């Protein structure tokens, strides 16, 4: 029988989520809950979960207790001191100084709303979120030759409203696209602007389009989901003349940034760096794809999306293969992508950048802010491995990288000192 560590690791790789409910002291009396892909839930799967329930509950309870030890939690810090940027923020701030007036780091979102919209309550709800999350009323200035966060105690957002009701449907859609493009290309001033903008287009009395734009230095993909979810909750409550039902946040992003600076040093930093220096030793390859046009001397970030669909039959075959090999769909497709890149470049040493949410602490799960990190996943196709052999190598590399995801990409670049070329990302060319 597999050890509890091995068993739970296997479930994790199969995208099975486990949690414990109940306050009973006995492991047997607590409820073990799970969420898993439909194809994973078999009679054998359920039987083994029941058989190992007691040791699973005990293990998860011990992990939960260790996570919530008081000395390990992030604590609020005084706002009377200069507040440092997180490592990710500092890198983004530096890039902004190199290219002032850029809109490259804008995060856009567009939502079409149908039905009655109480605009005054909608605006009030937006401002409640800004009041709730300090990071949304934070600016970034240079003080004594280093950037710091400056939190405004009173920032108010005004919705930019445009009425398009006088246009026909075709003209409206063209105008929506044009205005959305203009909004996306409009830069923020990190030192002075509120780093969130909202534009409301009225198409009819019961149809609206909302543009929401944030600067990446205060937000990420996970944060946008939090924002939309909280907006819906608060707006619903306000429409019913009820106060916001959301609990007060125990910490803010600035607390995380200060904690990260203090925590990621000494032995912790050395342990993380040791892994990545070993994984990325030697000359790092440059993936030169056979593009139609010469590569620009400086990255312009001007690109396009190409979407395609995989048939249901092939999708099921991929799922079956991933289950057979004990890997997630992501890892299987990552291996396939690396093989495809090998085919087009002939390069055996393949590096791909992979973004991760980096929300591996309970207290930051509900915060808006710039937490995302990028992992550098390096694999080698030398020795003519079979697909299954290479797939297992990719799996090992990926999970090992997840175990060392606390080192910010910015810190990794700083310590590796890669040869810089403005036409390429410093460590990888495919993300």
Predicted feature residues:
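Short beta-strand-to-loop capping motifs
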Residues: 34-38, 111-115, 163-166, 214, ...
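A generic structural signal for beta-strand entry/edge sites
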Residues: 24-33, 144-148, 156, 205-209, ...
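Short, charged/polar, Gly/Pro-enriched secondary-structure boundary elements
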Residues: 40-43, 154-160
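DNA breakage-rejoining catalytic core of tyrosine-based enzymes
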Residues: 301-315
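Non-catalytic accessory regions
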Residues: 1-68, 148
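Acyl-group handoff/entry surfaces in thioester-processing enzymes
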Residues: 57-61, 70-158, 167-263, 267, ...
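His-Asp-centered acyl/peptidyl-transfer active-site segments
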Residues: 79, 99-107, 134-135, 144, ...
């Amino acid at each position: 029988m597999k050890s509890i560590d091995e068993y739970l690791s296997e479930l994790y790789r199969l995208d099975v989520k486990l949690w414990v409910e109940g306050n009973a002291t006995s492991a047997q009396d607590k409820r073990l809950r799970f969420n898993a892909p439909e194809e994973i839930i078999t009679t054998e799967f359920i039987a083994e979960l029941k058989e190992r329930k007691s040791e699973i509950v005990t293990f998860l309870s011990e992990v939960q207790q260790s996570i919530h030890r008081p000395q390990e939690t992030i604590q609020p810090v005084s706002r009377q001191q200069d507040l440092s940027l997180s490592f990710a923020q500092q890198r983004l701030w530096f890039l902004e100084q190199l290219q002032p007036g850029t809109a490259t780091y804008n995060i856009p979102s567009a939502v079409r709303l149908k039905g009655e919209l109480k605009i005054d309550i909608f605006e009030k709800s937006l401002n409640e979120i800004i009041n709730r999350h300090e990071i949304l009323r934070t600016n970034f200035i240079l003080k004594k030759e280093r950037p710091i966060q400056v939190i405004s105690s009173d920032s108010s957002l005004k919705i930019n409203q445009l009425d398009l009701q006088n246009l026909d449907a075709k003209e409206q859609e063209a105008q929506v696209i044009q205005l959305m493009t203009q909004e996306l290309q409009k830069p923020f001033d990190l030192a002075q602007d509120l780093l969130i903008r909202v534009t409301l287009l009225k198409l009819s009395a019961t149809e609206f389009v909302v543009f929401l734009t944030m600067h990446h230095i205060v937000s990420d993909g996970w944060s946008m989901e939090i924002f939309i979810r909280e907006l819906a909750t608060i707006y619903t409550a306000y429409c019913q003349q009820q106060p916001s039902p959301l609990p007060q946040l125990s910490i803010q992003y600035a607390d995380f940034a200060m904690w990260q600076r203090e925590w990621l040093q000494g032995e912790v930093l050395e342990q993380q760096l040791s892994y990545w220096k070993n994984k990325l030793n030697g000359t790092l390859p440059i993936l030169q794809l056979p593009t139609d046009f010469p590569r620009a001397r400086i990255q312009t970030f001007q690109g396009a999306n190409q979407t395609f669909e995989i048939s249901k039959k092939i999708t099921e075959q991929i799922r079956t293969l991933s289950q057979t090999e004990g890997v997630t769909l992501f890892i299987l497709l990552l291996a396939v992508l690396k093989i495809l890149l090998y085919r087009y470049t002939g390069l055996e040493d393949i590096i791909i950048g992979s973004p991760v949410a980096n929300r591996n602490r309970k207290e930051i799960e509900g915060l808006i802010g710039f937490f995302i990190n990028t992992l550098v996943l390096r694999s080698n196709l030398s020795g003519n491995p079979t697909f299954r052999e290479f797939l297992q190598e990719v799996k090992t590399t990926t999970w090992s990288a997840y175990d060392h995801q606390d080192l910010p990409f910015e810190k990794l670049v700083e310590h590796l000192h890669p040869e810089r070329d403005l036409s390429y990302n410093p460590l990888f060319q495919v993300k």
